[in-house]
Amino acid sequence: MAFRALTTKAAARPLLALGPRSVAMGARYMSTPAPQDPKSKAAAILDSLPGSTALSKTGILATSAAAAIYAISNELYVLNAETILLCTFTGFSFLIAKLVAPAYKEYADKRMQHVSGILNSSRNKHVAAVKERIESVSELKNVTETTKVLFEVSKETLELEAKAFELKQKVDLATEAKAVLDSWVRYEASVRQLQQKQIAESVIGKVQAELANPKFQDKVLQQSVADVEKLFASLK
C-alpha cells in the first residue's frame, strides 16, 4: 500500500510540475482583452448553476470547491494535463453555450415565426377558399327550381320555334304558289297576246287580200257610187 502511494506520488510529480505551466497557458488562452465586471461575472456564474435561490447555488458552488480541494489535497484526484484539457474544453463549451445559444435561439425563434406565419397564411387562405366554395355551393341550393323554370322556358321556346318553322313553311309555300300562278298568268297573257296578234294579222291579211281582188274593188266601187247617188237623190 505504501509502495503504491510512493509510486503514485512519484508519477504525479512531473504532472504537478507541468500543471502550473498548462494552467498558465490555458489561462492565457482563455483571457479576454476587455475587462469584465466581477459582479456581473459572479452573477453569470451563479445563473449557470442549478438551483432556485442564490443560497442554494452558493452552497452548490462551495460544496463543489470543497470537494475538489479535498480530493486534490488527499491525492484522491491527481491534477494532470487531461484535467487541464478537460477544464479548458469545459470553459470553451460554456462560453460557446453562453454566446452562441442566444443567437441560435433568436435565429430558431425567427425561423419558427416565419414558418408559423407561412402555415397560418396557408391555413387562412385554405379556410377562405373553403368558405368561398361553401358560399358558391349554397347559392346553388335552388338549382332544382331553376332547372324546372329553364326546362319550361326551353319547352316554350321549342314550341314557338316549331310554330315559327310551320309558319315559315306556309309562307314559303304561298310564295312558291304565287310565283307559279304569276308565271302561269304571264304565260296566258303572252299566249293571248300571241293569239290576238295572229288573229289581227290573219284579218289584216284577209282584208288586204280582198282589197287586192279586182272583183271586190269593183263591188266596193259600185257600192260607193250607189251610196253617192242615194245621197244626191235624198238632197233633191
Curated annotation (Swiss-Prot):
<keyword id="KW-0809">Transit peptide</keyword>
<comment type="function">
    <text>Mitochondrial membrane ATP synthase (F(1)F(0) ATP synthase or Complex V) produces ATP from ADP in the presence of a proton gradient across the membrane which is generated by electron transport complexes of the respiratory chain. F-type ATPases consist of two structural domains, F(1) - containing the extramembraneous catalytic core, and F(0) - containing the membrane proton channel, linked together by a central stalk and a peripheral stalk. During catalysis, ATP synthesis in the catalytic domain of F(1) is coupled via a rotary mechanism of the central stalk subunits to proton translocation.</text>
</comment>
<dbReference type="GO" id="GO:0015986">
    <property type="term" value="P:proton motive force-driven ATP synthesis"/>
</dbReference>
<dbReference type="GO" id="GO:0065003">
    <property type="term" value="P:protein-containing complex assembly"/>
</dbReference>
<keyword id="KW-0496">Mitochondrion</keyword>
<keyword id="KW-0375">Hydrogen ion transport</keyword>
<keyword id="KW-0813">Transport</keyword>
<comment type="subunit">
    <text>F-type ATPases have 2 components, CF(1) - the catalytic core - and CF(0) - the membrane proton channel. In yeast, the dimeric form of ATP synthase consists of 17 polypeptides: alpha, beta, gamma, delta, epsilon, 4 (B), 5 (OSCP), 6 (A), 8, 9 (C), d, E (Tim11), f, g, h, i/j and k.</text>
</comment>
<dbReference type="GO" id="GO:0046961">
    <property type="term" value="F:proton-transporting ATPase activity, rotational mechanism"/>
</dbReference>
<keyword id="KW-0999">Mitochondrion inner membrane</keyword>
<feature type="transit peptide" description="Mitochondrion">
    <location>
        <begin position="1"/>
        <end position="29"/>
    </location>
</feature>
<comment type="similarity">
    <text>Belongs to the eukaryotic ATPase subunit B family.</text>
</comment>
<protein>
    <recommendedName>
        <fullName>ATP synthase subunit 4, mitochondrial</fullName>
    </recommendedName>
</protein>
<dbReference type="InterPro" id="IPR013837">
    <property type="entry name" value="ATP_synth_F0_suB"/>
</dbReference>
<keyword id="KW-0472">Membrane</keyword>
<dbReference type="GO" id="GO:0045259">
    <property type="term" value="C:proton-transporting ATP synthase complex"/>
</dbReference>
<dbReference type="GO" id="GO:0046933">
    <property type="term" value="F:proton-transporting ATP synthase activity, rotational mechanism"/>
</dbReference>
<keyword id="KW-0406">Ion transport</keyword>
<keyword id="KW-0138">CF(0)</keyword>
<dbReference type="Pfam" id="PF05405">
    <property type="entry name" value="Mt_ATP-synt_B"/>
</dbReference>
<dbReference type="InterPro" id="IPR008688">
    <property type="entry name" value="ATP_synth_Bsub_B/MI25"/>
</dbReference>
<dbReference type="GO" id="GO:0005743">
    <property type="term" value="C:mitochondrial inner membrane"/>
</dbReference>
